[in-house]
Amino acid sequence: MARIRARPWAIFIFLTWLIPFTTTIWSTGIFARGETTLPLLFKGDTAYSAIQDQLNYGNRIPGTTPRKECANYFKSELAQYATVIDHNYTLHGIACQNVLGVLNPTESGSIVILGAHYDSRAKADKDPISPDSPCPGANDGAAGSAVLLELARVFYEIRTKLQVQIWFVFFDAEDQGSGGLSGFGWAEGSQEFAINLETFLGSTPLSAVKLMLLLDMVGGTGLRFAKDGWTNSEIQELFFQLGRDLGYASAFPTDPHYFSKSLIDDHKWFASRGIPSVDFIIDFTDPSGPWPYHHTTGDNLAHISTDSLDITGKTLERFFHEYYVSAVDGGGGKNPFWGMTGDWFLTEAGAILISCVFGACVVLGTILAFKAYTLKKHEVLKE
């Protein structure tokens, strides 16, 4: 039986190719997985207080004084952590206003948008008793906005570690479609913002906006997130798995309700512009579900849960730790693959290609050198 004899030079050739190749693979982060050591700072109680603050202004219906006062409240709170920008526009003859807060403005190469609407619906049309009364909007409006404010505080604390620019956007005129306010459609405030993104980007290209994360009805009791057709499914599944890893399996079920693209929410306009987007939203269509207060007067503080606010906020906080804080600073140092759309071959694949070419050159050079050596040795023996 023939024996295969391992030759040291063959092992050397293999290693000269393998070492630079694997080093490049790991350094680019394609398979990198880190364990973050950063503590979770999000406080559901603080977010709950921010919901209460918003409700204290009254019904935040577009064009009303409570809506204006609530926008000023956001601006005052955000000014502690971010650069504040007004976005004023008119819809159907009514003055509307989005509020933008920019954290880490110098990190212009990578931008993540966190959004929520803050207007409350003018008519509680699903309410069996008072369908013409306005909705308090504790969950559908105030909850997502409250989580944004608390995340602004949290991320400000670690701003020097975050390798990303974060936009906190509070949208007006989201919840007035189908008869809420005469002439209004759904999510018109966010549509205005998405159409005019370049105005806020200035000289920064649209490609710098890597991700849009929307929070809609995230503070109600019995939190159970759904999925939809406008959301990037791969990124959303990453969030669902992250939530389960944090112990929030009931909020991130393996069999969530699925909305098709018929769901019109604020993230739709960003997804339509090619920005990967994720909607954190519940199944609000089931009257016998865990939160049956959608577009009713029951959407009040009595049906808000600090646990739900904690789950939402801490899952998002951990996400940023893992993908936008380096391992050196206690983060996960993972690769935000959604940020490489259109540029992948210039970054990761390019690095791999260079590594392969380098490895191939080393192998070829080693083979040629070995052949030259053996040929010379053979000639010496002949002499």
For each of these PLM feature ranges, what is it?
Residues I4-T36:
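Hydrophobic secretory-pathway targeting helix
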Residues F21-T24, V357-L375:
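Alpha-helical transmembrane segments
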Residues W26-A71, S288-H303:
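N-terminal capping segment at the start of a domain
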Residues L40, S49-T106:
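A non-catalytic alpha/beta surface segment that caps or lines the substrate-entry region
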Residues R60-P62, T90-I94, P105-S108, Y118-A122, ...:
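Solvent-exposed loop/turn segments at secondary-structure junctions
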Residues S133-E237:
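Acidic/histidine-rich catalytic neighborhood of metal-dependent amide-processing enzymes
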Residues L211, V218-W344, E348:
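Active-site-adjacent substrate-binding region
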Residues T374-E383:
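Cytoplasmic C-terminal tails of single-pass
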